[in-house]
Regions:
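Conserved SAM-binding strand-loop segment of SAM-dependent methyltransferases
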Residues: 62-71
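Conserved SAM-binding motif I beta-strand of class I
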Residues: 43-48
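S-adenosyl-L-methionine
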Residues: 1-18
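Conserved class I S-adenosyl-L-methionine
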Residues: 20-29
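Conserved SAM-binding loop of SAM-dependent methyltransferases across substrates and taxa
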Residues: 30-40
Length: 178
């Protein structure tokens, strides 16, 4: 099931795109965002598995390549600098991140972790879970939440900060087959 996002979400995503980027748009829908990204980025590769969403599209920008396929089932090119995953109900976030890291991509625009807006996720090195003592966290596997701690230690700045982590309890559970 596909549905377009509001203009504020698209604009937030576009603000993260740089002219030198080679972008992989995973689940590109009707290409409305991919076409706009192609006006900014060096190259865009858009993958959408529903052919009906791609049919009858106006002429495409020259820097846009469209693939009708399941992004989980096809190889991705190396050289991707930025990926887009606007899929707020995505259940394969960790699999996508793992593949993006494998091809060298280090930045991801997504709404899959928090289910709203658009954030830029750094796919590079992240803090280990054991270093987080209190506050909001977002893991590379897609899990998010709040780690409670002593109320006296909670500050306004800490409430605004999101700890970007690896190996949260959900990751550890899946690694142990739980």
């Amino acid at each position: 099931c596909w549905a377009p996002y509001d203009e504020a979400t698209y604009q937030a995503a576009l603000n993260f795109v740089q002219p030198a980027d080679v972008v992989l748009d995973i689940g590109a829908g009707d290409l409305r965002l991919a076409c706009r990204i192609a006006n900014i980025a060096q190259q865009v590769i858009a993958i959408e598995r529903q052919p009906g969403l791609l049919a009858g599209h106006a002429p495409l920008p020259p820097h846009l390549t469209v693939l009708c396929a399941d992004a989980r089932a096809i190889p991705w090119p190396k050289g991707i600098t930025l990926a887009v995953l606007l899929m707020r109900h995505c259940t394969h976030f960790n699999a996508y991140v793992t593949r993006l890291r494998r091809i060298g991509c280090r930045r991801l625009i997504t709404n899959a972790r928090w289910g709203m807006g658009a954030e830029l996720v750094n796919l590079g090195c992240r803090a280990d879970w054991d270093t987080v003592k209190l506050g909001w966290y977002a893991c590379v596997c897609g899990q998010t939440g709040f780690l409670p701690g002593p109320p006296a230690a909670l500050t306004a700045a800490l409430m605004e900060h999101i700890h970007e982590v690896e190996t949260c309890p959900a990751c550890r559970g899946s690694q142990q087959g739980v």
